[in-house]
């Protein structure tokens, strides 16, 4: 199994990318890594070249580059070359911690969309109070969506949850402002109707945002605009809560003593809410596994993303989506590439 990795994408590239790769090849003897980027900089952190190949390029996509323009103009960028390796059959999947929009554009323009899938979807696994986590899509690939798209999102998320997260018959829910079937706008009402009348996956109905982290669903479907706001709200709320908790525990001698006894429990709580432990965000709907690692990923974050991609390839997630897509085909959907 060969995995193409953009060594130059992310806040801590290439150091943390390379260190994560080193950890992965040491752990998994069945993978080979193709590292795309500045060879001199990569070699500074490369401690073992076993099953690691460097493909040198000086070009990279910056975090503030306009995604589509950058992908079209920077043909030799590390991210683009990693995707091209997948397109050419030289790698089975690709990973980048770089510009999210550029990676989505690269996935669509270079690797290509699955026939029968109208829109791709960005899908991370988010934490729950039980530590189990849930897959949520779309979180930003599409600002607007149609009911047919959300129907397909449910299928893609369900396949991933079953194959990679090892959940038998995953519970798929639709994000809405209420649990009743009649609640919501035109998009959610029509999506509910389509999802209710299919048998490709287990649809359990609507879910409210306040219940997302309570482990009531394994897959949650929404449009990209709403999903991205939910993600940022969860991130911001979590960070604010931890900050307030820290200030409270360090305020006064008694609280500091209590904090010393609670340190281990608090660290476990923080780890449980750290969704980087689940890997990166999958770009579903393209012809091969493409995963966006968090931009601030450290070596462990890259390692967990490689582990995630390895599972996707091994369990044939993309192939299963291709085989199952006709089960959620709706008359009048868009033509595909």
UniProtKB/Swiss-Prot annotation:
InterPro entries: FA_synthesis, Phospholipid_synth_PlsX-like. The keyword Methyltransferase does not apply. Its EC number is 2.3.1.274. It catalyses: a fatty acyl-[ACP] + phosphate = an acyl phosphate + holo-[ACP]. Its main location: cytoplasm. Catalyzes the reversible formation of acyl-phosphate (acyl-PO(4)) from acyl-[acyl-carrier-protein] (acyl-ACP). This enzyme utilizes acyl-ACP as fatty acyl donor, but not acyl-CoA. This is Phosphate acyltransferase.
């Amino acid at each position: 199994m060969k995995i193409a990795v953009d060594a130059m994408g992310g806040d801590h590239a290439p150091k943390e990318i390379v260190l994560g790769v080193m950890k992965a090849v040491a752990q998994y003897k069945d993978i080979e890594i193709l590292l795309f980027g500045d060879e001199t900089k990569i070699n500074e952190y490369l401690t073992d070249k076993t099953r690691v190949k460097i493909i040198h390029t000086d070009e990279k996509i910056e975090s503030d580059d306009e995604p589509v323009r950058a992908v079209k103009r920077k043909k030799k960028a590390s991210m683009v070359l990693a995707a091209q390796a997948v397109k050419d059959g030289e790698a089975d999947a690709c990973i980048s911690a770089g510009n999210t929009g550029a990676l989505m554009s690269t996935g669509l323009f270079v690797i290509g969309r699955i026939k029968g899938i109208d829109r791709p979807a960005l899908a991370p696994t988010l934490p729950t109070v039980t530590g189990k986590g849930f897959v949520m899509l779309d979180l930003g690939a599409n600002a607007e969506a149609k009911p047919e798209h959300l129907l397909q999102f449910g299928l893609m998320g369900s396949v991933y949850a079953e194959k990679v997260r090892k959940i038998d018959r995953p519970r798929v829910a639709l994000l809405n402002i209420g649990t009743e079937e009649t609640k919501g706008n035109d998009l959610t009402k029509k999506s509910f109707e389509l999802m209710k009348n299919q048998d490709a996956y287990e649809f359990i109905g609507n879910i409210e945002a306040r219940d997302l982290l309570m482990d009531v669903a394994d897959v949650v479907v929404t449009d990209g605009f709403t999903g991205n706001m939910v993600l940022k709200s969860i991130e911001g709320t979590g960070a604010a809560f931890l900050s307030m908790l820290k200030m409270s525990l360090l305020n006064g001698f008694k609280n500091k003593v209590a904090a010393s006894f609670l340190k281990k429990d608090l660290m476990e709580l923080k780890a449980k809410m750290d969704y980087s432990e689940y890997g990166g965000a999958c770009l579903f709907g393209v012809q091969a596994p493409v995963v966006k690692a968090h931009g601030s990923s450290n070596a462990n974050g890259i390692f967990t993303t490689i582990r995630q991609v390895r599972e996707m390839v091994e369990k044939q997630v993309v192939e299963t989506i291709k085989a199952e897509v006709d089960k959620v085909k709706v008359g009048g959907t868009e033509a595909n590439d």
